[in-house]
Amino acid sequence: EALGLTVINAGSDSKVGPLAALYRGIGKTVYGLCDKQGEEEASAISEQVDELFMHSEKGFEGLLLKHSPEAALIKYANLIDWPDHLKMKFPDPLSDIQSSMYAYFASKKGEGAAADFLSQCNIDEIPEWLKETCRKLKANCEPVVGNEDAQVEAVVDVSDVF
């Protein structure tokens, strides 16, 4: 928000391109953020956005699990209240941290569990793709020096990322 970005959830990756085209059509700068896409889908989205930020995993949960240190996953697993159905499935969630945390994130999708996980990470535990994407967005949205009155207008579509 401080960068002048408006976040819009397209609802699914297939709707990112059409929604981006709508906002570009009214003169907005559009950044697209999404999960790994096939070549055709990625190309279609890229044509409609000013810059595409696509991570290398099929889902955001996969990004967190594959690109966060195991210690961060264990730390978070010890902090959360496990739902009863997952306690039954994973009596010792730490013994299979990848599977248990995937199940947890999947069961809490849309409830802020991924953001909650990231909020307890130190900077070194946050996946590099997230840090690099944030750096690029910040750099792209910095007001031009000498033009303090400039307003940055950008739309970010995060699709199913968060």
Regions found by a protein language model. Name each.
Residues 1-162:
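Acidic, Mg2+-coordinating catalytic modules of nucleic-acid enzymes
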